[in-house]
Amino acid sequence: MLALISPAKTLDYETALPTDEFTQPRLLEHSAQLIDVCRKLSASEIASLMSVSEKIATLNADRFRDWKPEFDFSNARQAIYAFKGDVYTGLDAYHLKDKDIDFAQQHLRMLSGLYGLLRPLDLMMPYRLEMGTKLKNTRGHNLYEFWDDIITNRINEDLAAIKSELLVNLASDEYYKSVNEKKIKAEIVKPVFLDQKNGKYKVISFYAKKARGLMARFIIENQLNKAEDIKAFNTEGYYFDADNSSAKELVFKRDEQ
């Protein structure tokens, strides 16, 4: 199976890295085109476009200016260690074993507004460019139009490389929209995580994001390859709810503590 997760806004370029192994992103010629567009924006235009403060906008204007596709450890780090958010708290990549990272490199992918599709050990320079950003570019009015079928085609190539016909969608809706489902040459399964609050089960963003990371870790550590195997997930109190699940959507619930 191949699992998809979203990136994170928060980045960590300080924590000591557990490995010096790395690969280079595979869609850099496309990333460079986006950088060219972003470099033409002023800090105030970035602030407006991304709905961020002037401070964050200035930081990212500097990042766009400094970006260059010769990545090494002086200016970049592996994606799985660079992202720091709720999903990555659940994934806890720093405590994965070497064999787990090897498996993840083949079976886990991170969607990205700038890099398209990242493998865990792909080096990346710091950036902020969310997939939902309405950035006018040479291919359209937003990043979905820019990436078009490029991400989808790469996913299909990665599925073929591991001889798999199962894609596990652990990404947010914003990022998963960059994938053309109709052209994916695999069965697609989406785990959904519901937490009980005041007697009702619902998606609670913080918990759901962390649970996606926990599920990614579960897949990696157990080297899963069948949709049926996912149903055994029981980390941090979650359990599979067969009655509310379907072939395409696997529901996991957690009772209120």
Curated annotation (Swiss-Prot):
Which pairs of Cys residues are joined through disulfide bonds in the record?
A: none
One GO BP annotation is: response to hydroperoxide
Gene Ontology CC terms, in alphabetical order: cytosol
Cited InterPro entries: YaaA (IPR005583)
Judging by the UniProt lineage, the source's domain of life is Bacteria
Q: Which Pfam families match?
A: H2O2_YaaD (PF03883)
What protein family is recorded? Belongs to the UPF0246 family.
Name the chain's protein: UPF0246 protein ACICU_02469
What organism does this protein naturally occur in? Acinetobacter baumannii (strain ACICU)
